[in-house]
Amino acid sequence: MTTESDTVTDPVTTPVLHLVMGSDAGMAGGTDTTAIIADVDVYSLDSLNLSRVRGLIVNGNCDQIYLERRREILTDFVANGGRIAVMGHPLTDFLPDLGQWRKLQYSGPKDLAISAGSPHPVWEGVDPVDLSFRREVSGFYGRGYSQKLPDTAIVTNYIGRAGLPVDYVYRLGRGEVLVHGGIDLSVYQYDPNTSSRVFPQLLAWLAQGDGTDLR
C-alpha cells in the first residue's frame, strides 16, 4: 500500500531547483526565470524526484538541521553528477567537505571588499567592485569567510584586507559544489552593472547546458 508520504513527486520540468523555506525565498526575492528554475519547499526534499534535475540552489535561509538529516540525498545527487550551489552561511555538515563559515571582523569598506580569485564561469565578466558595493553600501555580498576548505577547493573570490575565501567550488564524486558565503546571488540579477551577470551565469552553470541561455 502506498501512502501519500511514500509517493515520489512527478519529475520536474526545470533543470534547476531552488530550495526555499515554504513560500519564503528569503533575501533572494524569488526569480522569474521560470524556464530554467523553480522554487521548491525544502521540506519536500524527501519526496522529490531528482532524476531529471541537474542543479540545486540551497537558499540561505533553509533549515540546515533538516538538510543535515538528508545529507545522503544531497550527497548522492552530487556524486552522481549533479551540481549544488549553497548560499549563505553553512553551519552544519549537510554535504561532505563543506568548509566552516566564520563571521568577519570589520570596521570599514576595505574590510569587506571583494577581490577575484581563480576564474570561473559563474563570475565571468563580473567586476569585483560591483560586488563590493551595492546601492553604494558595502557588505551586501558577504560579511564572513570560510575556513577548513577541502584540499581540492578552488577559491573564486576573496573578501577583506587579508584575502579570505568567500566563494569556492570543489568536486564531489562526478559533480560539483559551489559555496557562496553571503547574500543569495539572485538579488543581483537586476542591478545596473556587471554584478547582474552572476545569477544567470550561476543558473547556466547549474543547468550544465540544459536550458535557456539567460545571459
Q: What are the functions of these language-model segments?
A:
Residues 5-13, 27-35, 112-195, 209-214:
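Catalytic beta-strand/loop cores that center a nucleophilic Ser/Cys/Thr
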Residues 1-8, 42-43:
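A short, compositionally biased domain-edge/stem linker segment
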Residues 22, 82, 100-103, 175, ...:
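Glycine-centered flexibility motif
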Residues 64-137, 198-201:
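A glycine-rich, often tryptophan-bearing local segment used as a flexible ligand/cofactor-contacting loop or short
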Residues 203-208:
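Basic, nucleic-acid-binding surfaces and adjacent catalytic neighborhoods in DNA/RNA-processing proteins
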Residues 12-98:
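Helical hinge/lid and interdomain linker segments adjacent to catalytic or ligand-binding clefts
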